[in-house]
Every structure is written in structure tokens, then in C-alpha cells.
Amino acid sequence: HDICDSQLDNEQVSLAGNNEEGFVPGIVPEFYRIGGLYKDPNWNGACVFTPWAYYQYYGDEAVLRHAFPVIERYLAYLDRQTTNGVLENYAQMGEWGEYGEHTPNVLVATCAYYRMLMIAKQICEILKGQKENKLDEKAKLYEAKAKAVRDAFYHHPECYDEATGQFGTGSQASYAIALFSGMAEEHEEQAVKALVEVVKKNGYHLTSGEVGLKQVFTALAEAGYSDVVYQMVMNPTAPSYRVFADTGLTTLPEYWNYDELWLGSMVRSRNHAMMGHVREWMTSFVLGLRPQS
């Protein structure tokens, strides 16, 4: 099904939310802000991630060209939010919806920032025919900035432990987010092995939230471990997608422990698309329908 028109409309709205500081809100138009939950690069960064995903599937350079000025302003804004090169004490949502394991916000946010810088570099290289915008120079600047962020990440105690090779807290998401973003490129083999081990240690149960879930599935599948993803998805005990289906749910809850929250004082959404990453895994890695490069 061709959804390019609707996605393009959504992207236009997102870009229009860019303010004079370069900030892009998580809700556009920004009729209101949800208390302390309005700034996080994995949400606000849709202004970078969405046009890039659109280009990967449709090959439309015009979308990148239109989005790039906003991307530049947003990345400049994020740079001003860093402390010693990382996004510390900035992201408000982090690994939203995580269950049983915690992943540090600084790791989640900084990996997102690093990934955006590398995307910006690639966009510059794709559009570099526009010499008046000095995109060759900008590509080098984004690459240098990404390297600086990477170096800072590896020197932050909540992001990486050089003595043990552990990312973050050693959670599923800690390893997967570092792998997916490219931050763990030099330690890929060890990080993948550690990710598989922590999944097995958790009895093939899902512990990742909204950000890490897609990245856990992707990191495992790209390394040839779709069998591990399958066991997680079909796990007969909670939390798992199979348990959702066996319970009779026809929509996705916001949290893995939706039943506890539903019966308690915090009634949360039971119609939330954010945990739907299993569908992308099935399409991309089971059916094999994904971009070639």
C-alpha cells in the first residue's frame, strides 16, 4: 500500500513546528505541552528520521532538500543542549515503556543524536550538487561532530564501561540502541553476543520500551538472530505479543504490564501503535521486503 502522500503530509506538519531556536516539538501543531514530556530527541527528531526513512523507501531527494534547513537548525539546537558532548539531563522520555530493565536516558538520547548527525552527513553527500550550500564542507563538519559525540559517549560512565565492555546497564535496549545507531560499530561482535545473552537470561522476554524495541529486533535480525526474535514474540509467558493475542487483545497497549496499570490507579492507553515494531520485523526480515541499500 502506497502511503507516501500521507507520510509527506505528516512530515510537512512536523517541519512547520520548527521554532526560532531550532526546537521541533513532539506534538505539532503544539497546542499544548505534556508537563515534563515535551523534549526528547527520539520524538522531536522525527524532523530528521522521517524524511530520511521516506527517502530510503521512495528515493525522493526533494524531501531531503526541503527538510534539510530544519534538520540543520534542530541539530544546532541539540548541540547547545549537550554537556561534555552528550545529552545528559535533557531527554525526558528516554526508553519509554521499558519493563524490568532500565536503560539510561543519556545513552538513549546521545545515540539518537549521533544517528541524526550521521544521517545529516549522508544527506549532505546525496545533495552535494548544490554547491551554493557548501554541502561538502557541511558533510565533513557533521562527521567531525559525530566523532566528537562518539568519543564523549565512550567516556561517560552511564554509557559504556571500558573494563567490562558493557553498554549502559547491560539491558537489552542498552546494547541494541548502541548497535542500531552505529555507536557500537567497533564493538559490534561483542555487543551482539551480549545482547543475545541478556535476552536468553531474561527467558526470551521483552524488556524494551518504545525506542529500544525496534532496535532490539533490528540488531538481532541483522546479525542473523531472527530465531531469537521469534522466540521473544511467541513467548507463552508475559511479556510477549503472544500473551497479548492469547488474552484476546485486538489493539496494542502502551505498556507490557498494561493489565497491572489498568487495574491500578494509572489507567493507560490500550490502543497505542508504539509497540508495533514486530510488524516491521516480519515485513523486513521474515518476508525480506526492505531497501537494498
Predicted feature descriptions by range:
Residues 1-293:
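Active-site core of glycosidic bond-cleaving carbohydrate-active enzymes
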